[in-house]
């Protein structure tokens, strides 16, 4: 049975070897490009221009399909937007796990580089599935008149407060705690679940993605509260999982965040 090499026994040359550098460069490039896209497209994505952005547009011949949130064009644009946001928001907090995997993986440099990319792709595959769900939810909310296409923020303070309160409750569940613990200890996670080869990298990437999803899905849905394309709100929500994952477990950052979310829900109802 193969054993996982201990990171502290690896020479500096291996820690700075090509697979680690390539993984780090790929992560950095993906994060920078995703954030660059968000900054280059700061206006709300309302599907080829919504009725609120151009008065009278909905009355023009042929524009009905363009304004339909269930049209293929709109759903594809919404999915792409959510997928890019998940890359920008979730890859930074996953970077320690991904780089650790690249460091301790065995095999030739080509095999380690391949395994690192498989790990990243499978991790992102989980968030891609979430992005599909989020895009469909967005279309349903717009179609139901609950999410204005020009802001992509919930119109109802009651509904927004309910979503924030639900996220606070999830923070207090044992499932959230279990998922967060897996994300807070990259070394323990890799040592427990690491398997050699491409298949091992695929399983590890999917497993980490699922734990990360269980930890952060409710926070990501809060994008509907402050605005799906509100850059300040996106940055704030991206910071929350990062803080949860890098702070010591004894600090119970998830519990503090639950309290803040409950206060936020109350504020939405009060004001």
What residues fall within each predicted segment?
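Residue-level signature of transmembrane alpha-helical entry/exit and packing/kink sites
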Residues: 23, 27, 74-78, 115, ...
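Selective transmembrane alpha-helices of multi-pass membrane proteins
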Residues: 20-32, 147-173, 253-271
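Histidine-/acidic- and/or cysteine-rich, low-complexity loops and terminal segments associated
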Residues: 2-83, 107-108, 146-152, 174-195
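A small-residue-rich subset of transmembrane alpha-helices
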Residues: 110-140, 215-250, 256-263
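Alpha-helical transmembrane segments of helical membrane proteins, especially in multi-pass transport
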Residues: 168-178, 200-228
């Amino acid at each position: 049975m193969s054993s996982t090499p201990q990171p502290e026994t690896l020479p500096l040359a291996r820690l700075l070897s090509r697979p680690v550098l390539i993984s780090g460069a790929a992560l950095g490039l993906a994060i920078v490009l995703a954030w660059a896209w968000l900054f280059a497209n700061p206006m709300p994505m309302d599907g080829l221009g919504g009725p609120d952005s151009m008065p009278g547009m909905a009355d023009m011949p042929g524009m009905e399909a363009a304004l339909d949130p269930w049209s293929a064009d709109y759903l594809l644009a919404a999915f792409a937007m959510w997928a890019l946001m998940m890359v920008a928001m979730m890859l930074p907090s996953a970077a320690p796990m991904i780089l650790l995997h690249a460091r301790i993986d065995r095999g030739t440099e080509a095999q380690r580089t391949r395994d690192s990319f498989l790990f990243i792709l499978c991790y992102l595959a989980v968030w891609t599935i979430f992005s599909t769900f989020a895009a469909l939810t967005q279309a349903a909310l717009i179609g139901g008149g609950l999410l204005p296409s020009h802001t992509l923020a919930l119109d109802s303070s009651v509904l927004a407060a309910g979503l924030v309160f639900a996220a606070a409750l999830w923070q207090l569940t044992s499932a959230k705690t279990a998922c967060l613990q897996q994300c807070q200890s990259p070394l323990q996670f890799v040592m427990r679940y690491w398997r050699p080869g491409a298949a091992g990298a695929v399983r590890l990437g999917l497993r980490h993605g699922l734990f990360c999803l269980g930890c952060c899905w409710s926070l990501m849905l809060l994008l509907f509260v402050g605005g799906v394309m509100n850059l300040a709100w996106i940055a704030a929500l991206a910071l929350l999982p990062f803080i949860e994952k890098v702070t010591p477990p004894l600090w119970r950052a998830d519990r503090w965040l639950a309290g803040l979310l409950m206060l936020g829900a109350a504020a939405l109802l009060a004001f």
